[in-house]
């Protein structure tokens, strides 16, 4: 199980993980690592939250919010943001399904993708600033949001089909069992409720799961399934929705 954790940490983040820690693990086994997603989100969000706390007293809330969101993007290598941009470029092209998938494969950033990145990043910065001004514990909020975003992404894997013939997302999409889905969501709920006591964390998690489930159904109808890009989009939007639900 520890090998799966290190493999998942290396897969969806840019944190330095020695290859020997996940040595002997086949790529086809990665689907079992989905249950680690909330814990990886907890780590990434915790680092981002610490950066916010350290910078808040020095440069103020707005700049601290800017740098903590920037740090989160750097910690993931922009992996999920790239998926968000590609998904928006494809979906909002209003083309046929096959053409949408082709556009999503294009490495060039389109207008819709650029606008999506600006909107999501700017909204995250504003929401983090507002939450901090309201006295929300930002270390807990950011850690819980990142855990919720990655945990809720399982809703685009379970009982969904892969929209392409090959790709990184094929490791997870359609390969996750009902038990793994329940465990992943359960762990995300536990993280959210422990970090944000009372109903606040639980309510935000419920809102996030509902929104990501609806997103998954809309993408399924439009693209005929999911891709690695749509998983990245779900993670980014899940984080944002969770933070918005805390307001």
Curated annotation (Swiss-Prot):
GO terms for biological process: cobalamin biosynthetic process. Keywords: Cell inner membrane, Cell membrane, Cobalamin biosynthesis, Magnesium, Membrane, Transferase, Transmembrane, Transmembrane helix. Pfam families: CobS (PF02654). It catalyses: alpha-ribazole + adenosylcob(III)inamide-GDP = adenosylcob(III)alamin + GMP + H(+); alpha-ribazole 5'-phosphate + adenosylcob(III)inamide-GDP = adenosylcob(III)alamin 5'-phosphate + GMP + H(+). Its main location: membrane. One of its GO terms (molecular function) is adenosylcobinamide-GDP ribazoletransferase activity. Signal peptide: none annotated. InterPro entries: CobS. GO terms for cellular component: plasma membrane. Belongs to the CobS family. This is Adenosylcobinamide-GDP ribazoletransferase.
